[in-house]
């Protein structure tokens, strides 16, 4: 069975078929960098990080783009409040965002395009819309004429007549109809501005993502993601302007994360009920936050509670205890000449757990169900280790490989496995140094030199000192 993805556009799960075999091109809406990023945002970016990791684990080459909105009404407003330069303010919070993502072990996007570095691309996109009759110039900017795009509402299921009902154009607005949205905003005194065919100004919000995604991923690509709050109007407007420009389908699969809730309300800066990522990281390990997010399906609402985070913390400790139990047991493990009932039970638990994990992740990246499989394997291995005096090396190796796979997909245990690998490498190097010393004692210098030379080819340089042989890593 292949991967199935819930497509917001069709409101159903669909078999995942990328446009290009073996390659996935995906775009995730990035932040407007005017403040610290909160845990609600972290939920979205961790979810798409795991989706990307799983696609890569399944053998796809993934090209991932995430934009930065570094000029916007919110940035200008905050800069006016603080007295900072809007560019410097945006640069500061962009840097903080990247630091937060690194702390949360979210893999960097392949490309992070910034709005301010793509102004000419945006102008060119708007001109195409004008040429095709979808955009017009008003007194205060350039607008997209929504009524001319016949498929408007296909993502959000919003009806145009409902938008128009009771709405009106505010005095001073230069648009024809209340539902039309800005593509280019003419500059107000003191605002950042760029030259354009319509006078000095800056881009509207929605046009940025259409321009930058098509520039780097093409006029059609596989996945567009973001939080559920972006479905309307942002993603709806993106579809309208992009498909009006290109004349064909833009994105094949639309994916949206559920809200992070606090006391029954969506966590948001506007409601003032948010916890920044930095505040959360002061209290909890990054892997606790990742596990907290993964305990719920990415489309389901997630309640932000101390109890939930403590539960994730305890679960993470349980899994680390299992890893340590396996590592320690390796020291007394024996080669398998025959299996008993305990080995067959442990093997079947690992086999079944792996299948359940893949089945869950193939079913619209259901991390909650996949985690259940992880704990089933964890419990089975701990039970096995209490049942036998000398565990079989083959069983422990299969369990170890299972948890390495989980680490690769979920982005947890990565430092642990890295340290274990480093420890194994050091032990092997020490063994080779001891073998080489023995060969030198036996005057088998050719073989001793071969060990030295081969290690050097691998980036390990041996140095013979009066105190013994030492080693260091070198570039080769």
Swiss-Prot record:
Matches recorded under SMART domains: DALR_2
An annotated Gene Ontology molecular function: cysteine-tRNA ligase activity
Catalyzed reactions per annotation: tRNA(Cys) + L-cysteine + ATP = L-cysteinyl-tRNA(Cys) + AMP + diphosphate
Binding site for Zn(2+): 29, 209, 234, 238
Residue ranges the record marks as coiled coil: none
Record has Coiled coil as a keyword: no
SUPFAM superfamilies (alphabetical): Anticodon-binding domain of a subclass of class I aminoacyl-tRNA synthetases, Nucleotidylyl transferase
Name listed for the protein in its UniProt record: Cysteine--tRNA ligase
Organism expressing this protein natively: Thermococcus kodakarensis (strain ATCC BAA-918 / JCM 12380 / KOD1)
Lineage of origin: Archaea, Methanobacteriati, Methanobacteriota, Thermococci, Thermococcales
Originating gene: cysS
């Amino acid at each position: 069975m292949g991967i199935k993805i819930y497509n917001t556009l069709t409101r159903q799960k669909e078999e995942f078929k990328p446009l290009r075999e073996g390659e996935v091109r995906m775009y995730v809406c990035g932040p407007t960098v005017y403040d610290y990023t909160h845990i609600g945002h972290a939920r979205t970016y961790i979810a798409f990080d795991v989706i990307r990791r799983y696609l890569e684990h399944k053998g796809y080459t993934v090209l991932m783009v995430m934009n930065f909105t570094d000029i916007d009404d919110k940035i200008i407003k905050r800069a006016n409040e603080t007295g900072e330069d809007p560019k410097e303010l945006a640069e500061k919070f962009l840097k903080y965002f990247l630091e937060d993502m690194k702390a949360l072990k979210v893999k960097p996007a392949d490309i992070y395009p910034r709005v301010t570095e793509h102004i000419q691309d945006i102008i060119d996109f708007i001109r195409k819309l004008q040429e095709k009759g979808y955009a017009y110039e008003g007194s205060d900017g350039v607008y997209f004429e929504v009524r001319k795009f016949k498929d408007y509402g296909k993502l959000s299921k919003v009806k145009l007549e409902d938008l128009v009902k009771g709405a009106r154009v505010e005095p001073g607005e230069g648009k024809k109809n209340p539902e039309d949205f800005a593509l280019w905003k003419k500059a107000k005194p003191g605002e950042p501005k760029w030259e354009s065919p319509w006078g000095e100004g800056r881009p509207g919000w929605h046009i940025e993502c259409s321009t930058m995604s098509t520039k780097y991923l093409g006029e059609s690509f596989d996945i567009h993601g973001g939080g559920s709050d972006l479905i309307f109007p942002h993603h709806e407007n993106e579809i309208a302007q992009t498909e009006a420009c290109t004349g064909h389908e833009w994105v094949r699969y639309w994916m949206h994360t559920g809200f992070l809730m606090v006391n029954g309300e969506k966590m948001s800066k506007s409601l003032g009920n948010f916890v920044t990522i930095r505040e959360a990281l002061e209290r909890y390990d990054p892997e606790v936050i990742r596990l907290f997010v993964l305990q719920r399906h990415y489309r389901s609402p997630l309640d932000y509670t101390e109890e939930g985070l403590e539960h994730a913390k305890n679960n993470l400790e349980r899994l680390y205890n299992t890893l340590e139990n396996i590592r320690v047991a390796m020291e007394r493990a024996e080669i398998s000449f025959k299996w008993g009932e305990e080995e067959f039970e442990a093997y079947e638990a690992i086999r079944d757990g792996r299948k359940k994990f893949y089945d869950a992740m193939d079913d619209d990246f259901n991390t909650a169900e996949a985690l259940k499989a992880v704990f089933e394997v964890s419990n089975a291995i701990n039970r096995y280790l209490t049942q036998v005096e000398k565990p079989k090396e083959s069983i422990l190796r299969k369990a170890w490989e299972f948890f390495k796979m989980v680490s690769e997909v979920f982005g947890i245990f990565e430092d642990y496995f890295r340290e274990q690998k480093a420890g194994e490498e050091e032990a092997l190097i020490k063994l080779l140094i001891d073998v080489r010393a023995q060969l030198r004692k036996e005057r088998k210098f050719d073989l001793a030199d071969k060990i030295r030379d081969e290690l050097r080819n691998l980036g390990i340089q041996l140095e013979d000192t009066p105190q013994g042989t030492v080693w260091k890593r070198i570039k080769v």
